[in-house]
A protein has these predicted regions:
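Short, electropositive alpha-helical surface patch
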Residues: 101-116, 249-254, 278-287
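Mid-domain alpha/beta scaffold segments of enzyme catalytic cores
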Residues: 28-163, 167, 244
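Active-site phosphate/pyrophosphate- and oxyanion-stabilizing loops and adjacent acidic/basic residues
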Residues: 78, 105-106, 184, 217, ...
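Mid-to-C-terminal alpha-helical segments outside catalytic/metal-binding sites
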Residues: 2-21, 28-46, 71-88, 258-260, ...
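Active-site beta-loop-alpha junctions enriched in small/polar residues
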Residues: 53, 94-95, 121-125, 145-147, ...
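A short acidic, helix-capping loop that chelates divalent metal ions and anchors anionic groups
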Residues: 58-63, 203-205, 235-238, 271-272
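Alpha-helical packing segments of well-folded alpha/beta enzyme cores
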Residues: 76-80, 100, 160, 179, ...
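Catalytic pocket-lining loop regions of alpha/beta-barrel enzymes
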Residues: 151-263, 314
Length: 315
């Protein structure tokens, strides 16, 4: 077994080679984001963005990858933080890289490991030793990106959820609406903490009357499920700038369980190939969905700090 110090040294060397020191210079424009204005809503101290990715062509995509974005670096992401006011974050392994989590782990080191966590992708038969190593490297969950071809399947949830619960990690789930309907009983039976990406992709039209929404509401009532108020554009039919149909779903989630909502920018918005959204507007929409300062702070600070193991104060 490789000593822990050696593993850390390897990660540190990889990070130093890939990314120069992150600049603190003010930026007006953000790569992979429309607009230049700051949001009207003011982020509370210690605000956490629970969903963003980095991409780098020096890391080969997995065979069959369907999303192949241009490079999006930690430096680029810092510009987004300066624009919207967040200071902490959770880096999500994209489907592009399969189970090769090196880039997201190195990005965490470049951004500052005390203020960032990682959600990884692993094989269904991942050894316990690898999970422990990933835990040391800041990983706090596994993503089941089931709407895209990948190493994990719906059946993998049943296999891995108990193991992740032992680590106090999250099962981060990205499912199509029909998958949620078809697997409602399985989802209800899973142990541990479930986090649904992108408003759980509640379909439009239909929204609050749809079966997937009602299933997610049932999971919220169970008490071990969180919803990520991210990617309104994934399911919206009404579209920008307000994504009113998806926004109605988001506001209903907040009203039902404000203590189990988190937010993510989804930068660099890999699914939006023609026109990138305005991240400042998306942040202002979150404030509208929250309906008040107390819920806004819960969503951005209190809830994600508890879920991913950050300091609750942001200090």
């Amino acid at each position: 077994m490789v000593p822990t110090l050696t593993r850390r040294a390897v990660v540190g060397a990889l990070t130093a080679a890939l990314f120069p020191p992150v600049s603190r210079v003010q930026a007006q424009e953000v790569k992979w984001s429309s607009g230049t204005a700051k949001p009207r809503a003011i982020a509370p101290p210690g605000a956490i963005d629970c969903h963003f990715h980095t991409y780098d062509k020096r890391f080969p995509p997995v065979a069959g990858a369907t999303l192949l974005p241009e490079d999006a670096s930690p430096e680029d992401y810092r510009a987004l933080q300066r624009r919207i006011g967040t200071s902490r974050g959770v880096i999500i392994q994209p489907s592009t890289y399969g189970t090769d989590n090196r880039l997201q782990i190195a990005s965490r080191q470049a951004l500052g490991p005390e203020n960032f966590r990682v959600v990884a992708v692993v094989a269904e038969d991942v050894p316990d030793a690898e999970l422990r190593q990933l835990n040391e490297q800041g990983v706090r969950g596994v993503r089941f990106n089931l709407g895209f071809p990948g190493v994990l399947t719906v059946a993998s949830l049943k296999v891995l959820a108990p193991r992740l619960a032992e680590l106090d990690w999250t099962c981060q789930i990205n499912m199509r609406p029909k998958q949620i309907e078809d697997n409602a009983d399985l989802l209800m039976s899973l142990p541990g903490k479930l986090v649904f990406d992108h408003l759980a992709q509640v379909p439009q039209p239909g929204g609050l009357e749809s079966a997937p929404y009602k299933i997610i509401r049932g999971l919220l009532d169970r008490g071990k499920t969180w919803v990520k108020l991210s990617g309104a554009y994934v399911s919206s039919k009404s579209g920008p700038p307000d994504y009113a149909d998806a926004g109605a779903v988001a506001a209903a989630y907040v009203k039902a369980a404000p203590e189990r909502m988190v937010w993510g920018s989804d930068w660099p918005h890999p699914s939006e190939r023609e026109q990138k959204p305005d991240d400042a507007r998306l942040f202002d929409l979150l404030a509208e969905w929250a309906g008040g300062e107390a819920a806004f702070k819960k969503i951005l600070v209190t809830n994600p700090a508890d879920l991913y193991g950050f300091s609750p104060s942001g200090q």
